[in-house]
From Swiss-Prot:
Protein known as: Squamosa promoter-binding-like protein 10
UniProt lineage: Eukaryota, Viridiplantae, Streptophyta, Embryophyta, Tracheophyta
Main location: nucleus
Residues that coordinate or bind Zn(2+) 1: 181, 186, 203, 206
Underlying gene: SPL10
Keywords of the record: DNA-binding, Metal-binding, Nucleus, Transcription, Transcription regulation, Zinc, Zinc-finger
Length: 426
């Protein structure tokens, strides 16, 4: 009976307790290793139980467990030793998976390139969502169509341009040649020269040389144009071409001419008032000087007269008219020139009026001087021929104007009364 049950169990499964384990992937860590150990232990127990059953008729725990599985005890919970492995038999956890094995869900197409400093995307030839939609490159939103054949060439161009822009004269500027002199046979390196010489590609020696062989011709470097010209465009040993030198001289002379014109205009403006207010001629000055001398001599002759003497001075009318005719014409500043017919008459009248005022002042001064000497009365009769514009033309020969000037002088208790009579003849 016992043997039949064991045979039935062995026909179904070599491990009768295998079905008792809960199904599910990864239920136990290191399941394969633990299963092999359990199988070996079960086989040894089965052989020991069979020996005990046939020879000693003792109780077999493994056989009881099998009976409970296939008998009426299928609803009982499994034994705890069958669910958990001993700690010594537990396998270590598996190592973490390497990064290359973690592939993304969307694989990049073979046409996609991600260089160090730029990204280039191309239209993929394969199917798929990316191929159908098409990718947009970094070319300002435009589609980039590159075949796999020109991939390396495009990468070189991009890397060269980007490296040259980022590092300056580093990677990109490695192929840049330094500036050299353009004169034949010179080819001097201008890397350490001045900026002017580097810019125009000429060394300092050939920039100042009178004759330079450049481009197969005898030329000279122009300082104004900053380039080479043939020798026929220069004047003798000049370092500037004829055209630019003429322009330079014209620019320099233009301010000088303007300054000269301004100075001449200023001189003319200053000379205009001087010409308008210049002194009278020599004849007029001599005439005025002679008249003043005559007045002074007359006053000197009258000064020693005593207080009791009466003096009458009468000048011939003809002589006065002749002297008036001989006197020059007096001009007034800012006045309009007189007419030719009335010019001598108006000038003579103005001069006579001025002379009359001077005579009157001289006589008055003499009277005051004589009056201060002693007591008595001084009577002076002055006869002069005066032509005045203020007098009427209908005057006769003997218009007499009496002017009585009473001057009271308190000098030593004496009163001096002076009576001045002026007789004007027309």
């Amino acid at each position: 009976m016992m043997s039949g049950r064991m045979n039935a169990a062995g026909d179904e499964s070599p491990f009768p307790f295998g079905a008792m384990q809960a199904p599910g992937p990864g239920a136990y860590v290191g399941f394969d290793h633990g299963a092999a150990a359990v199988a070996a232990a079960a086989a040894a127990a089965q052989r020991a139980g069979m020996l005990q059953h046939h020879h000693h008729h003792m109780y077999d725990g493994l056989d009881f467990a099998a009976a409970m599985q296939f008998g009426g005890g299928q609803d009982a919970p499994p034994h705890p030793q069958l669910l958990a492995l001993p700690p010594s038999m537990a396998a270590p956890p598996p190592p973490p998976m390497p990064m290359p094995l973690q592939m993304p869900m969307t694989m990049p197409m073979p046409g996609d390139v991600y260089p160090a400093l730029g990204i280039v995307k191309r239209e993929g030839g394969g199917g798929g969502q990316d191929a159908a939609a098409g990718r947009i490159g970094l070319n300002l939103g435009r589609r980039t169509y590159f075949s796999p054949g020109d991939m390396l060439a495009v990468d070189r161009l991009l890397m060269r341009s980007r490296l040259g822009g980022v590092f300056g004269l580093g990677f990109g500027g490695a192929h840049h040649q330094p500036p050299r002199c353009q004169a034949e046979g010179c080819k001097a390196d201008l890397s350490g020269a001045k900026h002017y010489h580097r810019r125009h590609k000429v060394c300092e020696y050939h920039a100042k040389a009178s004759v330079v062989a450049a481009s197969g011709k005898q030329q000279r470097f122009c300082q104004q144009c900053s380039r080479f010209h043939v020798l026929t465009e220069f004047d003798e040993a000049k370092r500037s071409c004829r055209k630019r030198l003429a322009e330079h001289n014209r620019r320099r002379r233009k301010p000088a001419a303007a300054a000269t014109t301004a100075v001449a205009a200023a001189k003319d403006a200053a000379a205009a008032p001087v010409a308008a207010g210049k002194k009278p001629s020599g004849g007029a000055a001599t005439s005025y000087t002679g008249d003043n001398k005559n007045v002074v001599s007359m006053s000197a002759a009258k000064s020693p007269i005593s207080s009791n003497t009466s003096v009458i001075s009468c000048l011939p009318e003809q002589g006065k008219h002749a002297a008036a005719a001989a006197r020059p014409t007096a001009l007034t500043l800012g006045g309009a020139p007189p007419h030719e017919s009335s010019a001598p008459q108006i000038g003579a009248m103005l001069h006579h009026h001025h002379h009359h005022q001077q005579d009157h002042m001289q006589v008055s001064s003499l009277v005051h001087i004589n009056g201060g000497g002693g007591g008595g009365s001084n009577n002076i009769l002055s006869c002069s021929s005066v032509c005045s514009s203020a007098l009427p033309s209908t005057a006769t020969n003997g218009e007499v104007s009496d002017q009585n000037n009473d001057n009271s002088h308190n000098n030593g208790g004496n009163n001096n009364n002076m009576h001045l009579f002026e007789v004007d003849f027309m």
